């Protein structure tokens, strides 16, 4: 019966599978996630690492939850670990759901969790990058467990390769994003100037001219967040 239902309601996988293999194929949302992760981590010298982890764990924000871990967010933070470190609540289903939803909804909180975890291991492993990444993935467990060490080693190699690729692509993303933002702000400023001009012209027609803005009074247009 179950097989019949699944067959009759087959999921169009081609429509839900995101492109995760190469950053040049990322969509706009994925590029923004990668840039966000990079900018958040770059203040601590871990920008490319944060971006690589976001790419590795969630396909740059496309797959935000793993029920088997359970983990969630753009970096797939381990939910029980987040509950233990950042709350005083018991690890029960309701709290897991709440924290999971928070990690998926709030990229800043998810980034805080990921960066603090990396910084903890950076200190603990005395700056050994390979051990930092292996420990980020498996904690201390890889040290005395061959299977977990093999898994942690593979994770490190994945992150290392992604960092190398992102060193080529993130500067391009940043330049394209900044150009796009510049054009957007210029358009907004031009629209505001046009609106002010229309108001001035309208008031002139009503013989109630608008007071001219002195040259010393500069207009600054704050970009929207």
Predicted regions, residues:
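Non-Sec secretion/translocation targeting segments of pathogen effectors
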Residues: 1-9, 221-225
């Amino acid at each position: 019966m179950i097989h019949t239902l699944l067959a009759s309601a087959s999921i169009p996988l081609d429509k839900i599978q995101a492109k995760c293999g190469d950053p040049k194929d990322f969509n706009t949302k994925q590029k923004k996630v990668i840039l966000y992760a990079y900018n958040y981590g770059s203040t601590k010298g871990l920008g490319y690492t944060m971006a690589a982890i976001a790419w590795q764990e969630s396909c740059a924000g496309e797959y935000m939850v793993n029920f088997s871990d359970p983990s969630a967010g753009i970096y797939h933070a381990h939910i029980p670990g987040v509950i233990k470190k950042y709350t005083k609540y018991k690890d029960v289903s309701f709290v897991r759901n709440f924290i999971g939803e928070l990690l998926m909804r709030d990229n800043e909180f998810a980034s805080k969790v990921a960066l603090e975890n990396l910084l903890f291991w950076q200190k603990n492993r005395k700056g050994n990058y390979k051990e930092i990444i292996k420990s980020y993935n498996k904690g201390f467990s890889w040290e005395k467990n061959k299977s977990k060490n093999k898994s942690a080693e593979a994770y490190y190699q994945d992150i290392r390769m992604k960092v190398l690729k992102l060193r080529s692509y993130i500067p391009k993303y940043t330049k394209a994003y900044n150009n796009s933002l510049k054009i957007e702000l210029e358009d907004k400023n031009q629209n505001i100037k046009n609106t002010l001009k229309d108001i001035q012209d309208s008031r002139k027609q009503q013989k109630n001219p608008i007071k001219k803005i002195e040259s010393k009074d500069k207009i600054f247009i704050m970009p929207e967040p």
